[in-house]
Structures are given as C-alpha cells and as structure tokens.
Regions:
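Glycan-recognition and catalytic cores of secretory/periplasmic carbohydrate-active enzymes
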Residues: 1-129
Length: 129
C-alpha cells in the first residue's frame, strides 16, 4: 500500500500528546514519579525524533518522511500541520483540561498541574455533579 511505510508528522505529534496526557493523568491519580518514568522516556524519544528529523529549520516541519527518515515530496501543507505541531510543542506546558486555546486564554501556560481558575468549561455537557 503506497505510503504505509512513511513517517508522518501528525502521528509523532499525537504520540507526544498521548505520552504527556497519560503521564499527567497517572500523576494526578496518585502515581509516583517512578511509576511514570516510562512515559517520560517515550516523551523524550518523540521530542528527540522531532528535533532530529521533522524540524528542517525554525518554524518549518517536514510533513512526511520515507522509511529511512528521508524527506518525501510533501503534500500540500494544511492548517492541521500547524495544529499538530503547536499541540505537541505546548502539551508538556499546559494542563490536561481545559483544551489548548482555553488553557492559554486563562493564563495556564507553564502551569500544567494547575486546574483552570474557573470551572465553567469543565462540564461541557451541561451536567451538574
């Protein structure tokens, strides 16, 4: 199948976000730092891969790499490329909730363990608990 052996930028970015989220959720649930060491290693591995292969110059990420991490003629860039890069870059610096844009607007950058000061957006289904 064409492209199945490619390494795509968005997949690596999602891996960064997933490792950060699992680590933080486990710590919030009472896990010890030694319990989440594996996720810290995964996070560092993803970030090292991004720096070594995906960032071609400041502000420029390669979208697709071949099986040997060589640049593949990129498809047309889209806003999703930026979305994934921003999410991966900020994941470690923001809390799990609220989502990225609301967390930034509430001043939660570099305060990942702090909940949002207002809880109005925490229950977006309108349920009261």
């Amino acid at each position: 199948m064409p492209g199945e052996d490619e390494h795509q930028q968005w997949v690596v970015c999602e891996g960064v976000c997933a490792t950060v989220a699992v680590r933080r959720a486990m710590l919030d649930d009472g896990a010890r730092v030694s319990d989440v060491e594996h996720f810290e290693h995964c996070y560092r591995s993803f970030v090292d891969y991004i720096h070594d292969y995906l960032i071609s110059q400041p502000g420029r990420w390669l979208r697709r790499l071949g099986p040997r991490n060589e640049n593949v003629q990129p498809a047309k860039s889209s806003r999703w490329d930026v979305y994934h890069a921003v999410q991966a870059t900020l994941a470690i610096r923001l809390p799990l909730w609220p989502p990225t844009a609301p967390a930034l607007s509430r001043g939660l950058l570099d305060r990942p363990e702090e909940p949002a000061p207002d809880k109005k957006s925490w229950n977006f289904f309108g349920l009261r608990g």
